Amino acid sequence: AAALSAGKLDLLDGEFLAWHLSGGTSELLHVKCGADGLPDCTCIGGTTDLAAGQLLDRAGNLLGLPFPSGGALDALALTAEPEKGFKPKVSDCKFSLSGMQNQVENKFKTAEPKQMARFALETVANAVIKATEQAREQYHCPILCAGGVMASQIIRARMNKRFGGEVS
């Protein structure tokens, strides 16, 4: 479905990395065309606890934003100054977001709402980019992104800046 909505059905004939980032899951898959012509998917990374969308919804809740909070959080964050975000530990394409949640909650105590929103989104982007970089050490193929979290202009821009035309 993600390949269809991105207009990238041609990816199904080869090999690619696929992120599904939402409130329910945050998984990085390696996908290749199987011998039977159907996609063969292997989960190679993602979160070990909290889904990316859960983290963003919790940040939005702290700010009093409507649920789900992704769109409103992104709009607020776009009004903020650029922010580096928290640099998570990523190992074998896997990372924990619960520690990032603590960082976001600490930022809430000390920063303006728009800066806290930006911090949360940049933190998720940092984790996703680092995991993707690790995956690309083994799999040199295009990247397909799906799920509500990838609707974020900030996260998508960061992915496109880092991986260029390789991201759909």
Question: Where are each of the predicted segments found?
Answer:
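Active-site glycine-centered loops adjacent to acidic/histidine catalytic or metal-binding residues
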Residues: 1, 23, 148
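Short, acidic/small-residue loops that bind anionic groups at enzyme active sites
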Residues: 1, 47, 164-167
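Conserved phosphate-binding catalytic cores of ATP/NTP-utilizing and phosphoryl-transfer enzymes
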Residues: 1-16
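Buried hydrophobic packing segments
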Residues: 1-4, 59, 132, 159
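A short helix-loop
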Residues: 12-14, 19-22, 26-112, 160
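Conserved SAM-binding loop
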Residues: 18, 144-145
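A contiguous, well-structured pocket-lining segment that forms one wall/lid of small-molecule binding clefts
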Residues: 75-143, 149-167
